[in-house]
Amino acid sequence: MSRTPGRRQRGFTLIEVMVTVLLLAIGLLGMLGMQTRASAVEFESYQRGQAVALARDMQARLLSSRGIVPGYLNPAISSVDGSVWVGNGSGAANFADANGNCPQPAPGDLASFAAAQACAWGRDLQGAAMRDSAGSIGAMVGARGCLIRIEPPQQNALADLYVVIVWQGIETRTDPAADSPAGRCASDVDFGPGQRRGISMRVLVPDLRKAA
């Protein structure tokens, strides 16, 4: 018995519908993948923007507080190897009081003035400047900040150091070189393979008395 043209047409129509559905599904999956990728790129960009702003904040603190710069050179606040850091994590230097507040500096004590500034910076790295009902949300994931001294410093400088911020990304990329400022800051913290992010700014605070 030969097949009727109507049955062949219905069979072809069903196949066409299935192919159309398959193509639509592939297209939707592609769009979803692109949207996910775009969201990841946007979040990475947001984190880097926050890090740049916070690094510039510490840069401004250093340049505008020339009188207390020697206090920043205290080994409890800065280091030459990135082992001293503030921000997130149990290994962070903690300058806060028992209530979690940054202490008031003691008059004439340069180290306590610098510690108060480092404490405030550490709180900002924890996202304290922006909060919701769940807690701090204004900073990068796992952010840590270091002041890495350059020794010997530039001639006629009160301080010569790197302001460094590291944090955890959400995409796998190339980690900073181990001997770079971003690789040395909080180097014992494992963010995961290819997920360490970092920026650094060299800050030179000149000794204006010698320059004159």
Model segments located where?
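Aliphatic-rich helix starts adjacent to a transmembrane/signal segment
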Residues: 2-56
